[in-house]
């Protein structure tokens, strides 16, 4: 049951009383803490929630409906957002979510987000820099588009969720992070370990590039941004371990250890020319 006060709530807000909370599966940082209450989702707010909400409202106002509409921040420290109905695949990902059709639809959705975000000024807002583009930029990016952060209907991506890593950057970097997670960019061992079936990964990167609408220069930029994306996630993981974050250490131990980042880097370096040739 939920009552209380919503901070930053517009006149359309409705506080539901007597509606049971339904826990939603998924997530790493907030695992077990995300619930559905009727038409809304409640999840722990973060230091950047106000900025994220402003961004989500702006892209919705621009006509892009593929993100949840923020409702407000509860006085119990949870943010409330619109619930978007559909299927959210969790690892090990089901076959339908690993198809080229699913990948292309995720990529087109990201392109739609980027187009809608161009009118939003990130200045004056605060952002999570953990996965942010090291080169910086002026376009707010998602930075963590993986299948479990996407809502699907009938195998087609219809919405992006979980924007806690959103930050300004380059569109190519955001697309590279999507590719790292959705192609995926992993060696054979880790691809199988996390439940991805064997696939032609260079060909899948081309599927993403085609779906986004990249020209020749854009494909070169994507290849270069892949290096930044691979380096950034490794640096974030090592930083969490160095600071002794128990949740990060437990997650890392459960998902292959710090060695998986070395394996990914070696695999990407060994296959870089193959990816470049396929993208042409």
What are these regions (language model features)?
Residues 233-280:
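ATP/Mg2+ or Mg2+-diphosphate-binding catalytic cores
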């Amino acid at each position: 049951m939920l009552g209380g006060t919503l901070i930053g709530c517009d006149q359309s807000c409705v506080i539901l009383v007597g509606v049971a909370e339904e826990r939603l599966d998924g997530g790493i940082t907030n695992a077990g803490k995300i619930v559905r209450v009727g038409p809304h989702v409640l999840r722990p707010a973060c230091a950047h929630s106000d900025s994220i909400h402003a961004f989500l409202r702006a892209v919705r106002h621009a006509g892009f409906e593929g993100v949840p509409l923020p409702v407000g921040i509860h006085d119990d420290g949870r943010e409330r957002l619109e619930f978007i109905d559909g299927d959210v695949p969790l690892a090990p990902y089901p076959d339908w979510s690993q198809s080229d059709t699913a990948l292309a639809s995720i990529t087109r959705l990201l392109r739609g987000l980027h187009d809608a975000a161009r009118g939003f000024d990130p200045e004056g807002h605060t952002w999570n820099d953990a996965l942010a583009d090291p080169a910086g930029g002026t376009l707010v990016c998602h930075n963590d588009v993986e299948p479990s952060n996407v809502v699907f209907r009938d195998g087609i991506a219809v919405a992006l969720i979980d924007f806690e890593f959103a930050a300004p950057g380059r569109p190519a970097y955001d697309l590279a992070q999507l590719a790292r997670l959705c192609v995926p960019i992993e060696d054979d061992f880790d691809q199988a370990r996390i439940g991805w079936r064997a696939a032609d990964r260079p060909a899948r990167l081309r599927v993403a590039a085609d779906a986004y609408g990249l020209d020749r220069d854009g494909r070169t930029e994507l290849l270069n941004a892949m290096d930044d994306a691979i380096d950034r996630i490794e640096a974030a993981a090592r930083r969490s371990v160095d600071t002794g974050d128990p949740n990060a250490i437990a997650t890392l131990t459960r998902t292959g250890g710090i060695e998986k980042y070395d394996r990914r880097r070696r695999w990407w370096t060994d296959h870089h020319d193959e990816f470049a040739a396929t993208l042409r």
